[in-house]
């Protein structure tokens, strides 16, 4: 890094440092908005929940939901570039363990190469990739996808590897479940085993999180778009291709969207930054939306705004 990761330096209208974009800027915006909303005697309750572990398994949000916490709506201030994102992808992690037979490198008659078998499988998966790309895209999220995340196998150059472990990640769309994903990968593995001699492999499921979406014309989405327009922000609808906590909230009956300052491309970067002006604008939008929602009128200008955003 060329900037101090925890320095919080201000340069040319930008805040620099680790997490500035993902998502300290969003937290700052929601806290600033909450402080202003709290001054007014509004009906209802505004809850701020700062949960941990979103980057891995979302254990913080999962615990919050299991505790019984619910609300009429939720805004997650991920970096969306001030676009309203009512949908995000899910994921399934899969491990394929290939078993070969160890032997000296000079004994091809005795060895079975587990890494070679993993390579055959990766090549066979090209057919699945083509099917996913040829399918009907989600209007906000595009196509489902997958990639090989890690591969591990072998002990020495002169030894046939008896084990190779391949970990894949499948990014899912709303409506795609874990069982269907497992069937996709198992079917290709079964077909391969029928034509590759001595192929011995086992597919197992790892961590999985669902994709989610809410209606574009819901009071939450429409209200945020209206608040954006009122604050001079182009009302934009988009999809979050990454996993975020919204799915847990939606599953528990709390409609949730992502809306926050900063560009997702800056997240996790070596020299992370966020435009300070976006934090201020985001806070203003959240304040306006909160006032309208708590007073039961989140959809002011909804028809015109939805037409413009769509």
Which ranges hold each PLM region?
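Metal-dependent amide/peptide-bond hydrolase catalytic core
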Residues: 86, 95-310
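Structural motif
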Residues: 13-14, 18, 47, 49-51, 72-75, 145, 236-240, ...
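Active-site metal-coordination/substrate-binding segment of hydrolases
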Residues: 1-47
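Solvent-exposed alpha-helices and their adjacent loops that cap or buttress functional pockets
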Residues: 8-9, 40-42, 66-69, 86-90, ...
